[in-house]
Amino acid sequence: MSVLIEIHQFPCLNDNYGYLVHEPGSGRTIAIDTPDAAVYLAEAEKMSWTISEIWNTHWHPDHAGGNLKIKEATGCKIIGPAGEADKIPGIDRRVKGGDTVELGGATATVIDVPGHTLGHIAFHFPDQEAAFVGDAVFALGCGRVFEGTMEMMWESLKRIKKLPKKTQLYCAHEYTASNAKFAVTIEPENKALKEYVAWIEKRRAEDKPTVPALLERELETNPFLRADLPEMQLAMGHAGNAAATFGEIRGRKDRF
């Protein structure tokens, strides 16, 4: 039987989501990234939890900026990507793809997802069908390719695509409404996308989150995850080349 974890999601900064993940059996709590130390500490107090570890997906300040203040307040350990260890404030343990990290009785696997940054990682809890993906992938979107190449980013998205379809993707930002506007320019006739967009509009009108995103739904609707489809490659002018098709879609989004 899989170990229960509790995921507490809350908004912080302009459009980030914060995540506290708690394993009741051990009483341990991890912070996934640290956009805003004060908000994280307040949310932990509200839940009567104490942050025991921080797990960073990448080095950007809206993901690791609160590390040192939270560490000072709680004495927590900080786990982060080995490839960005020099940029992760207060890092104690360096991890890379294939490593495992523990939260009490729950185990997460580290996945290398470079592209947005060169050392970007994700944390996948297979038994709990949850993946914390940082800025690698969003609902109907993916991160801008700041440090890596389009080929690198596509390989990262392929790793995410291989996760079980029922995996919930806990993305780091509420970008879904703007991503949806772009997605319909790529696949205007996609029926699943039209239904998803209607749901997104309703959720946002009610000021409710659209995250987490179900991988199964993303595979049917997220243009960035669909670059391996022959019809998508043809439409983007790169028949037989998924990486180039992805690059074309990403370039269009950058200019959108």
UniProtKB/Swiss-Prot annotation:
Pfam family name, one: HAGH_C
Pathway: Secondary metabolite metabolism; methylglyoxal degradation; (R)-lactate from methylglyoxal: step 2/2
Cofactor section: Zn(2+)
Its job: Thiolesterase that catalyzes the hydrolysis of S-D-lactoyl-glutathione to form glutathione and D-lactic acid.
Residues binding Zn(2+) 1, per UniProt: H58, H60, H116, D135
UniProt xrefs under SUPFAM superfamilies: Metallo-hydrolase/oxidoreductase
Molecular function (Gene Ontology), one example: hydroxyacylglutathione hydrolase activity
Keyword Cell cycle: no
UniProt KW Metal-binding keyword: yes
PANTHER family: HYDROXYACYLGLUTATHIONE HYDROLASE (PTHR43705), HYDROXYACYLGLUTATHIONE HYDROLASE GLOB (PTHR43705:SF1)
Single GO biological process annotation from the record: methylglyoxal catabolic process to D-lactate via S-lactoyl-glutathione
InterPro entries: Clx_II_MBL, Glyoxalase_II_hydrolase, HAGH_C, Hydroxyacylglutathione_Hdrlase, Metallo-B-lactamas, RibonucZ/Hydroxyglut_hydro
Name of this protein: Hydroxyacylglutathione hydrolase
Entry keyword set: Hydrolase, Metal-binding, Zinc
Family: Belongs to the metallo-beta-lactamase superfamily. Glyoxalase II family.
Binding site for Zn(2+) 2: D62, H63, D135, H173
NCBIfam families, sorted: GSH_gloB
Broadest EC class assigned to this enzyme: hydrolase
Family matches, as Gene3D superfamilies: Ribonuclease Z/Hydroxyacylglutathione hydrolase-like (3.60.15.10)
E.C. numbers: 3.1.2.6
Catalysed reactions, semicolon-separated: an S-(2-hydroxyacyl)glutathione + H2O = a 2-hydroxy carboxylate + glutathione + H(+)
Subunit relationships: Monomer.
